[in-house]
Amino acid sequence: MDINDISKAVEAVKQSSPQRKFEESVEIAINLKDIDMTNPKNRINEEILLPNGRGKDVKVVIFGSEELKAKAKGVADYIFGPEDISKFAEDKKAFKKIVNDAYFFIAEATLMANIGKSLGQVLGPRGKMPRPIPPGQDPVPLIKALKNTVKARSRNSLTLHVPVGTRSMDTQKISENIMAILNRITGKLERGHSNIKNVYVKTTMGKAVQVGTGDQN
């Protein structure tokens, strides 16, 4: 499949789905084949920076020192210090709300061990363990990059669902995002394109359109 096939599918999705009263996300479903997902080494677990962004904001949490917190102010959505780790360890319900609301977590490297010990039971199963950042490093570039990054995780399934943008985004930009994702995933598969059964594009509430055939599902 090439960029033209992808663009046709994206445009078909837009045409077939009525306008909603909210901004719909656009996502792809990548169906794999001939892969043993019971073997952990075959599972896909990728974070992919989209060339044209996600089209909407996602929330990023940072744990750090006063210096790191000051640098992250106005860019990160939740900013916490070392003292908040023990607070959340005692109030897991409050922490779970934040975890469910945020997409990525960052933590100063010196705090990682404490976070893993105190909050790992909440973060780990959700695939949201923090990315470590060295003390003193400016977190802003990483935060901005993560806000344009998506996760592609198969776990033990042969289907990956990955957000690629929003309906209001230009079709070409959405298509380029999809191409970037497919290139990354294909590069991780033992047999490349031969391990991909098919790819569908859909909006939040719309019908799925298969890339390359135009079939709806």
Swiss-Prot record:
SUPFAM superfamilies per the UniProt record, alphabetical: Ribosomal protein L1 (SSF56808)
Protein's GO biological process: regulation of translation; translation
One MF term in the entry's GO annotations: tRNA binding
Function: Binds directly to 23S rRNA. Probably involved in E site tRNA release. Protein L1 is also a translational repressor protein, it controls the translation of its operon by binding to its mRNA.
Protein name: Large ribosomal subunit protein uL1
Similarity section: Belongs to the universal ribosomal protein uL1 family.
Record's subunit section: Part of the 50S ribosomal subunit.
Keywords: Repressor, Ribonucleoprotein, Ribosomal protein, RNA-binding, rRNA-binding, Translation regulation, tRNA-binding
Gene giving rise to this polypeptide: rpl1
